[in-house]
């Protein structure tokens, strides 16, 4: 096989020797004290196939060991991490970033052209200050609305977890808790995220993660401007405990005059009132799904007046615009019982009117010529003509059969009648 005179096999000057890797916060791990091994010219870059210095480390407890996959030249050309190949500024795949910045990839694929392009990029990197990307990425606009909405600045350390144990999936793992791999159910093999390629990630072609993020960006919600022109207040949620009044003012003062800033620490939110409606609309448009302070993505919404909030709750619509469906199975509203005008002032519990029982006045003697009936159980038996079709008359309370007990307190067996069995007097 014919090779060029400047190929990596003979040109050892192109081999890379570095002292520290270019990593993102997620790949580096949450532990600030890590032990990292360095192997000079340990492997060849998976993009340009040049030998480079390989770094290997463990990002945390119960995490898998990670190492650099591409050389620093390829990393600087795309401004990506040497391990995960995600953008260092936004934490997004290269395909998503290039789509948001309208940058077209022009990296050659053949061996000779790739080597020539790499040497030119190394020369450009050496002549730069090292603070900005080189090539087409350095000439692109600084930011994009889509990138600010999709940016993932918070580290996601679960990405460093060990791989799934293939023996456990087959039911043959005998290590138990000492197994360094995860004992979890694998993902669906038909899932497009299960098939990822490092070269597709670097060149931004057919990246399943990028396709998923781009589809999410196309269906991203928008912040509608309220019809009430008197509303000039914005709701800022998810503040946490570190966001202060001055930090909010430093961000929102550029959109217009701020009248008041009210921070509710208990709810971790704030209300920012602007002097004009135009300033509030500009702040909402420029900050919706883009506001990041102290590494926290804040939620921006329009404030609502008390009248609009009460109307929304009455119509079954929440503050976020979600319509609540009625709960099935509940009875409808019952009409109030009919109450006369005389009892309306004293019927506090809306009870049905009942006939008042006859009360015997024991303090006054009966009028002359009137004989009072004896109490129940003390007089002679009274015989009435019974209608065979009439329902039976219920017995009085004292003569009701003992088997009908509706509450535990009505049971005579549980009212201390047999306390002598337990050692009582």
Swiss-Prot record:
Q: What does this protein do?
A: Required for pre-mRNA splicing as component of the activated spliceosome. Involved in the first step of pre-mRNA splicing. Binds directly to the internal stem-loop (ISL) domain of the U6 snRNA and to the pre-mRNA intron near the 5' splice site during the activation and catalytic phases of the spliceosome cycle. Required for normal early embryogenesis.
For this UniProt record, the keywords arranged alphabetically read as follows:
Cytoplasm, Developmental protein, Metal-binding, mRNA processing, mRNA splicing, Nucleus, RNA-binding, Spliceosome, Zinc, Zinc-finger
Quote the entry's note on domains.
The C-terminal RRM domain and the zinc finger motif are necessary for RNA-binding.
Taxonomic placement: Eukaryota, Metazoa, Chordata, Craniata, Vertebrata
Output one GO BP term: chordate embryonic development
Under Pfam families, the record lists: RRM_1, STL11_N
Q: Which gene encodes it?
A: rbm22
**InterPro entries, alphabetically?**
Cwc2/Slt11 (IPR039171), Nucleotide-bd_a/b_plait_sf (IPR012677), RBD_domain_sf (IPR035979), RRM_dom (IPR000504), STL11/RBM22-like_N (IPR048995), Znf_CCCH (IPR000571), Znf_CCCH_sf (IPR036855)
Give the family from UniProt.
Belongs to the SLT11 family.
Residue ranges of the region described as Disordered: 304-331, 384-425
Tell me the organism.
Danio rerio
> What is this protein identified as?
Pre-mRNA-splicing factor RBM22
How is this protein organized at the quaternary level?
A: Component of the pre-catalytic and catalytic spliceosome complexes. Component of the postcatalytic spliceosome P complex.
- Kindly list the GO CC terms recorded for this protein: cytoplasm; nucleus; Prp19 complex; U2-type catalytic step 1 spliceosome; U2-type catalytic step 2 spliceosome
**Zinc fingers (C3H1-type) at which residues?**
159-186
